[in-house]
Each structure stands twice: as C-alpha cells, then as structure tokens.
C-alpha cells in the first residue's frame, strides 16, 4: 500500500516488497502501475519479476520513499512533515495534487493547460489573497 500514498516516510529498518510472483499471482492494488512511475519501467520489472526485498535505503535511493529516519524518530518526522504541509493553503494543496495526478500521464502541452486552469482557479480565493498579503507584509500566511 505504500505506493498509494502521496509522501512516503519510513524507518531505517523498514523492508518493502512486491512478493506476488513468489506466490504464483500478479501484483495487485495497482502496484504494477504505480511502481514504474516511481522507479522506471526496467527497474520496476526487476523488482516485480524477482520478488526482491528492498531495504529502506534501497527504496529511498530508487525514489520509492521520500525520507528514511531512525525508528525512534519516525513519528516526529511524520508530524513535522504533516505540520509543514498543514501550514499551507489546503485548497491550493488539493488543487496541486489534482493537477499533478491528472497531468502526470498527459502530453506536456496538455499538462501545461491543466496547470494554467488550476492556477487561474486560485486567484481571488481567500487563501490566495491571504498568501499574497502575507508575502507583501513579510509575515507567515494564516490560512483557514
């Protein structure tokens, strides 16, 4: 399920694997679709075809994980990241996520138009006004 998340933080002792071929079945939960987007087609095939266990360090190097921390620091790192995200505009984050997800598999020119549409939708919103005002006043924005 790790491939279904937007941001991935794991402890240094974590191990990741797509073991399905060792059980005589194919990957489920879109693992065969999500993994190539993280690591590329060839590396995804290697990981899936071998059923190989990955260490947290391997997964970080491959781009599957965003961050690896010691087990005792994991929740502190998770909360720090969550708080950093929560300090920003929830509506802008939701639109950015949709923009990335929708445009990821499209031609760059179509993606550019999708991006422009989402960006235009932000202008005039309370969050955009607060963000620009805070920037002008050299203070942190206070989004609702």
Residue ranges and their predicted role:
Residues 1-49, 62, 77, 81:
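CoA-thioester-processing core
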Residues 4, 50-52, 126-130:
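Short acidic-aromatic low-complexity motifs
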Residues 47-51, 96-100, 135:
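Short alpha-helical scaffolding segments that buttress acidic/His motifs in well-ordered protein cores
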Residues 52-58:
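Acidic, divalent-metal-coordinating active-site segment for phosphoryl/phosphodiester hydrolysis
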């Amino acid at each position: 399920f790790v491939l279904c998340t937007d941001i991935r933080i794991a402890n240094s002792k974590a191990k990741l694997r797509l073991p399905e071929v060792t059980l005589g079945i194919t990957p489920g939960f879109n693992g065969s679709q999500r993994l190539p987007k993280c690591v590329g087609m060839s590396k995804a095939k290697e990981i899936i075809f071998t059923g190989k266990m990955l260490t947290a360090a391997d997964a970080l190097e491959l781009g599957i994980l965003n961050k690896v921390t010691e087990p005792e620091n994991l929740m502190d790192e998770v909360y720090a990241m969550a708080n950093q995200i929560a300090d920003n505009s929830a509506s802008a984050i939701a639109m950015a996520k949709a923009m990335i997800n929708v445009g990821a598999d499209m031609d760059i020119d179509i993606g550019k138009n999708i991006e422009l549409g989402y960006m235009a939708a932000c202008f005039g919103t309370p969050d955009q006004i607060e963000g620009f005002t805070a920037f002008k006043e050299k203070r942190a924005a206070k989004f609702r």
